[in-house]
Amino acid sequence: LFRSKGIYVYERKYGNKSITVLMNGTDKTQTINLTPYKEVLPTTSAHDVLTDQNIDLNKNLTLPGREMLVLEF
């Protein structure tokens, strides 16, 4: 579990699947620099299972307050 400025990031693995969850625990929209989380972000793109969209992990992410991303690799 990583925590920084109200952003929580954790990873779960099962077999050859990996899920990384990013949660904004604050009420404010936050821009997340993903560089510190490269250990749990094994590729440069991921599938967001909540929105069914592909996410580019080469750039910063914006996460609204009290929202989360569930990324599948």
Identify what each model region corresponds to.
Residues 2-73:
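Carbohydrate-interacting/catalytic domains
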